[in-house]
Amino acid sequence: MITRLSELFLRTLREDPADAEVPSHKLLVRAGYVRRVAPGVYTWLPLGLRAMRKIEDVIRQEMNAIGGQEMLFPALLPREPYEESNRWTEYGDNLFRLKDRKGADMLLGPTHEEMFTTAVKDMYSSYKDFPVTLYQIQTKYRDEERPRAGVLRGREFTMKDSYSFDMTDEGLDESYARHRKAYQNIFDRLEIDYAICKATSGAMGGSASEEFLAVSEVGEDTFVRATEGEYAANVEAVVTQAPEEISFEGLPEAQEHETPKSETIESLVEWAKGAGITVDGREVTAADTLKCMMIKVAAPAATEEEKEWELAAVLIPGDRALDEKRLEASLEPAEFELAGEGDFKKNSFLVKGYVGPRVLNAHDVKVYADPRVVSGTSWITGADAPQRHVVGLVAGRDFTVDEFIEAAEVKEGDPAPNGQGTLTLERGIELGHIFQLGRKYTEAFDVQILDENGKRAVPTMGSYGIGVTRMLAVLAEQRHDEKGLNWPVAVAPYQVHVAVANKDAAALEAGQKLVEDLDRAGIEVLYDDRPKVSPGVKFKDAELLGMPFIAILGRAFADGIIELRIRGGETREVPADSIVDTLTELIRG
């Protein structure tokens, strides 16, 4: 295939767009791959669409290889199936809702578990029909509160979502393993640097859950890896190793103290040191103090007006910050907000900066706590009065915890949950997520299948998603330099970019012959045949657009030499009569 730049619908930009924050956003816009329509909504221009179709082709090949069958559901969906699964409310404001002319509630699909489940229910009735794996590649819609980073986090995006249906849990394990391997094949073929991380299931529900995270400094997700072994997890899924419970016997009674100028953990620790207070014979540290973070929690609701907020508290050691993403994952599907001034005024028993767990118990405020706050541990915390703290407040004796959750930050150097080494922190971008959903949706939709004994049984499900548009942005993030994009062969819109920098007739004729020879060899060619564009502009555009191989017919062509630039790598001088063979060999790897 030959595409001429003189005919391609394309305009490159020399300056970064004003609203672009990350390299992928800047370069995809500058190189003419995408164009912004509205916040989080983008047009895919010819080059961008070709690259995205290449990614889809790789996904289809690997999905078909594990027995997946492609289908396509509508994006416009009725309310009722999502009402049955409770996700009409669980998705909250992230759901695009609308009404048709008859007043019926509709939505733009954020994901399609409900539709796949009802399709299987309506069409299959015997165990002989199973197992089955179905998938689609389709546009999804989520009303992100803060769309950012171009197509990395948009409100409209393309996903591959697949679903396995098995009659047994062992069958689900096999389907999950096949998908896991298929995902590894996809990311390996696309040359993405990624990590497979233990994850939470969130609103999707289910048990086993893993994320495929692309390693990137601009990633919104933090993940950890153990310095030894193969443990890796999204920070939201890291499980704190709780200490052993301690006997209350022999522990001194809690004592209140005046603590002037102790509004922060740092100043409280300094006060304790100055007062000569020790813990097991050592100086007090921030880890001996206990923060009481006030929050509000509400069950999911379709609108803000329907939410019923309840006061709650989160107790975490003073040497840790509150990690709102971990807290959100722990509370899902419920939502939370940090308590504001109005909440403190409304609940006069709360003394801001000096809240302690005793007053929370006394007023029936739900208390969540970090797993380190086990029974028998002793803490320095607020005494529910200005400039006062209590020393030696013992969990389980002086206050109680309603529920232990993961809400404290994970730190570099924390012990690895697998017991092998310590944790290192990295940033990543979620590309894929696989879940063992179990029977959450098949039970919700009363999917009844006759098993081999003629008895009714409920099949079990797996859910597997890949962000197609996000994958393109990730490749732009991971594979670029100061000159522009640098696509792998499997994704590049064209495999070879040919530019004629010498304007004499012989070079122009040779350029035409070269692209025709490349086309006959089955190589996809982008041909810069623009007659009134300088060689310098052609070179800059070639590097910006990012095709893996750039063939230049320049001054050396008079001696029968074509300059071959391997994008992001070496430059070779190749005899014109062997350039097609050289490129064919390079493309085949």
UniProtKB/Swiss-Prot annotation:
GO terms for biological process: prolyl-tRNA aminoacylation. One of its GO terms (cellular component) is cytosol. It is found in: Cytoplasm. It comes from the Bacteria. InterPro entries: aa-tRNA-synt_IIb (IPR002314), aa-tRNA-synth_II (IPR006195), aa-tRNA-synth_II/BPL/LPL (IPR045864), Anticodon-bd (IPR004154), Anticodon-bd_dom_sf (IPR036621), Pro-tRNA-ligase_IIa (IPR002316), Pro-tRNA-synth_IIa_bac-type (IPR004500), Pro-tRNA-Synthase_IIa_type1 (IPR023717). Its EC number is 6.1.1.15. The keyword Nucleotide-binding applies. One of its GO terms (molecular function) is ATP binding. Keywords: Aminoacyl-tRNA synthetase, ATP-binding, Cytoplasm, Ligase, Nucleotide-binding, Protein biosynthesis. It catalyses: tRNA(Pro) + L-proline + ATP = L-prolyl-tRNA(Pro) + AMP + diphosphate. It holds the Pfam family tRNA-synt_2b. Transmembrane segments: none annotated. Belongs to the class-II aminoacyl-tRNA synthetase family. ProS type 1 subfamily. Catalyzes the attachment of proline to tRNA(Pro) in a two-step reaction: proline is first activated by ATP to form Pro-AMP and then transferred to the acceptor end of tRNA(Pro). As ProRS can inadvertently accommodate and process non-cognate amino acids such as alanine and cysteine, to avoid such errors it has two additional distinct editing activities against alanine. One activity is designated as 'pretransfer' editing and involves the tRNA(Pro)-independent hydrolysis of activated Ala-AMP. PANTHER family: MITOCHONDRIAL RIBOSOME PROTEIN L39/PROLYL-TRNA LIGASE FAMILY MEMBER, PROLINE--TRNA LIGASE. Consists of three domains: the N-terminal catalytic domain, the editing domain and the C-terminal anticodon-binding domain. Homodimer. This is Proline--tRNA ligase. It comes from Corynebacterium aurimucosum (strain ATCC 700975 / DSM 44827 / CIP 107346 / CN-1).
